[in-house]
Amino acid sequence: AQQYADSKNLSVSYCLPFWITRYNYTDADGTTKNVYDLITQISNNTILMAYRDSASAVEKLVAQVQNGAEKSAFDYAEANDCNLEIGLQAAQTSEGDYVTFYEEEKENTGYINSVIAEIQSDLSEYQNHTTFAIHHAISLYEYYENIE
């Protein structure tokens, strides 16, 4: 996908789960490599779905080394000069309240914006953390429309 996009002067963003850093593969030469490391080498942008409902929990998923991983997502992105976009969940979900900002946003309109500002401040040492993706933002929009 990346080669095709490059040939057409298009950009590609790889949207991946936060636990991708835990996985390795063996290449044709028999060398074991990290999947996320490879993706950040060939891509200009990755979106890491860091679905948690607090700044500290999101920060742990992207800036700390996960169990079973050798490096953090930020370590790979920084080493390979790849932008790391942090994906935040905004929809009501059956996966549990801890994976989405839906409930917090209903209780305190604008909460997700304050969390983004907190993450930006806390992780300011990383040059490639400046972008965020709010997944299922339409849920928040519909909620705001109904309360007006």
Residue ranges of model-derived segments:
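Aromatic-lined carbohydrate-recognition surfaces of secreted/lumenal glycan-active proteins
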Residues: 1-32, 79-93, 133-137
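Glycine-enriched alpha-helix->loop->beta-strand junction motifs that scaffold or abut catalytic
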Residues: 41-46
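Proteins with a high burden of low-complexity, intrinsically disordered sequence enriched in S/T/G/P/A and R
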Residues: 3-4, 66-67, 71, 108
